[in-house]
Curated annotation (Swiss-Prot):
It is found in: Cytoplasm. It comes from Vibrio cholerae serotype O1 (strain ATCC 39541 / Classical Ogawa 395 / O395). HAMAP family: SurE. The gene is surE. Its cofactor is a divalent metal cation. Disulfide bonds: none annotated. Keywords: Cytoplasm, Hydrolase, Metal-binding, Nucleotide-binding. It catalyses: a ribonucleoside 5'-phosphate + H2O = a ribonucleoside + phosphate. Binds 1 divalent metal cation per subunit. GO terms for molecular function: 3'-nucleotidase activity; 5'-nucleotidase activity; exopolyphosphatase activity; metal ion binding; nucleotide binding. Its main location: cytoplasm. InterPro entries: SurE, SurE-like_Pase/nucleotidase, SurE-like_sf. The keyword Transcription does not apply. This is 5'-nucleotidase SurE. It is an enzyme of class 3 (hydrolase).
Length: 263
């Protein structure tokens, strides 16, 4: 079966859940939906407002309020993780989607950004709950059409030849016109320096208030990293795993514990 036939066959039953952390009205999620409507049934479940930086947080102290604002489009008073959790465990529990896609984020999620990112967290929740998931981020706020092109390319490739891993994928697209993007590279996460200092100001009543400083500059941004790909005009595709265990340290830590505590 050729690629076109495989895509046409998959379209008959394909269903995709979309979420994000920029909010249900954000430009990125609608660019994502528009790029895929003729490929699949699209369901949008996203926060009612911007929840950037929410990471994997869940709402535990009050109920989630959900509003249907259009056909197959739902606004949730909660975090990105809440949205995907609600969608897969309630809204779509009797017919789970084939893919969970998060984004298109308004700004890159590179290196250790992924630890804070609500965009990545929404995809991670889909992964936790057993659905192939991909997070998409645009390294800026202008060329959403370029990002949508690569979203569609990757989804079509998945339809014709399913992604050969059960890992979560983190995809970043340069904020450039399509003709200036070189292609797609598989990368690893880079790393930043520590974030800059807090910014102290006064509120109108003279009380001290504090803003988080901007993210740190790139520290590990050499060849093979997601930072390096984006800087050179390539789309970065990074497979992520949920297991945070430092496996290479297990033996040395076991030795240290026995030597210092038990010996």
């Amino acid at each position: 079966m050729n690629k076109r036939a495989a895509i046409q066959r998959a379209k008959i039953k394909m269903k995709i859940l979309l979420s994000n952390d920029d909010g249900v009205y954000a430009q990125g999620i609608h660019a994502l939906a528009d790029a895929l409507r003729d490929l699949a049934e699209i369901v949008i479940v996203a926060p009612d407002r911007n929840r950037s930086g929410a990471s994997n947080s869940l709402t535990l102290e009050h109920p989630l309020r959900v509003s249907q604002i259009a056909e197959n489009t739902y606004s949730v008073q909660g975090t990105p993780t809440d949205c995907v959790h609600f969608a897969l465990n309630e809204l779509m529990k009797d017919a789970l989607p084939d893919l969970v896609l998060s984004g298109i984020n308004h700004g890159a999620n590179l290196g250790d950004d992924v630890l804070y990112s609500g965009t990545v967290a929404a995809a991670m929740e889909g992964h936790f709950l057993g659905v192939q998931s991909i997070a998409f981020s645009l390294a800026g706020t202008t060329h959403f059409a370029s990002a949508a092109h690569f979203v569609r390319q990757l989804v079509e490739q998945h339809l014709a030849n399913p992604i050969p891993t059960n890992r979560l994928l983190n995809v970043n697209i340069p904020d450039r016109p399509l003709e200036l993007i070189q292609g797609i590279e598989v990368t690893r996460l880079g790393a930043r320096h520590h974030a800059e200092s807090m910014i102290k100001q006064k509120d109108p009543r003279g009380h001290d208030i504090y803003w988080l400083g901007p993210p740190g500059k790139e520290q590990d941004a050499g060849p093979g990293t997601d930072f390096h790909a984006i800087e050179r005009g390539w789309v970065s595709l990074t497979p992520l795993q949920v297991d945070l265990t430092a496996h290479e340290s297990l033996r040395s830590m076991d030795h240290w514990l026995k030597e210092k505590v038990n010996g």
